[in-house]
């Protein structure tokens, strides 16, 4: 199996600590969501940013492969930390909300969004592990 990319991140101090990547492109303080002050981030924000970016790349690729031009997809990913009835620790759930320009029908947009979900590496990694809601809006 060929590896397409590999990166490393190191955390010191957990949710009240610091995280950095091996190339220091990311080098930031970490806090728990309850202590967010705008000067540090938390694991849920980092997950949302990574998943949104990866998913939008997949969505844009699927649109282009299907000859949909000028759709200008935008993806907002909401990560929720919620109670888990099966465990004392919380669990994650996400909503993927995409918006594209009115160059295809709502039905086509939903089909391509589902295809992107099946293609996206983050979606593959979370499949069967977290609840994911998919939504797409076609706008003027």
UniProtKB/Swiss-Prot annotation:
Q: Pfam families in the record, alphabetically? A: OsmC
- One GO term of the biological process aspect: response to oxidative stress
* Record-linked InterPro entries: KH_dom-like_a/b (IPR015946), OHR (IPR019953), OsmC/Ohr_fam (IPR003718), OsmC/Ohrsf (IPR036102)
Which branch of life, at top level? Answer: Bacteria
Q: Which Gene3D superfamilies match?
A: 2.20.25.10, 3.30.300.20
Q: Which SUPFAM superfamilies match?
A: OsmC-like (SSF82784)
Family according to the record: Belongs to the OsmC/Ohr family.
Q: NCBIfam families in the record, alphabetically?
A: organ_hyd_perox
The record, for PANTHER family, names: ORGANIC HYDROPEROXIDE RESISTANCE PROTEIN-LIKE (PTHR33797:SF2)
Q: What is this protein called?
A: Organic hydroperoxide resistance protein-like
Name the species this protein comes from.
Answer: Staphylococcus aureus (strain MSSA476)
């Amino acid at each position: 199996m060929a590896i397409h990319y590999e990166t490393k991140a190191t955390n010191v101090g957990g949710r009240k600590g610091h995280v950095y990547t091996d190339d220091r492109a990311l080098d930031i303080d970490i806090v728990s969501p309850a202590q967010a002050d705008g000067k540090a981030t938390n694991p849920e924000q980092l997950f949302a940013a990574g998943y949104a970016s990866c998913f939008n790349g997949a969505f844009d690729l699927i649109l282009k492969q299907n000859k949909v031009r000028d759709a200008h997809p935008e993806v907002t990913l909401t990560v929720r930390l919620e109670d888990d009835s099966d465990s004392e620790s919380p669990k994650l759930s996400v909503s993927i909300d995409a918006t594209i320009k009115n160059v295809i029908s709502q039905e086509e947009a939903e089909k391509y969004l589902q295809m992107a979900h099946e293609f996206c590496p983050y979606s593959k990694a979370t499949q069967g592990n977290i609840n994911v809601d998919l939504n797409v809006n076609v706008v003027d």
